[in-house]
Amino acid sequence: MASLTDYAKNLLARALVGRQPSLPVAAWAALGTGGTDAAGLAGEPAAASGYARQPVAFTGSGAQRNIAPLRFAFTGSVGTLTHVGLYDAVAGGNALAWGTLGTPATLNAAGTITVPAESLTVLAD
């Protein structure tokens, strides 16, 4: 993922100096139309379209990559989605990271957008 959010940067800074922040216990992937370091992902589709964030399990010793494909199912059109985000909750919660999809996904009818296994990478640099 291209960028950690300000929230995630603050978590890391507190962890590095031993302040023991409350770390996420799960990660959820989201799709959207943009993003910023301050707010994270922007333009998530409405739940009425069948959209829901997907749980993500990661593996790796340095760079963390999604173990399994992520499948976002939609019951109707959502247009073009260009970004992916990582959150600490299935709804609401805190944005942790965001970045652009390798290829924008356009969905003009019901269907599924799949993010392949090992294509979502989280790396602090």
Predicted segments, located by residue:
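Small cysteine-rich, disulfide-bonded extracellular modules of the LU/uPAR three-finger superfamily
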Residues: 1-84, 88-125
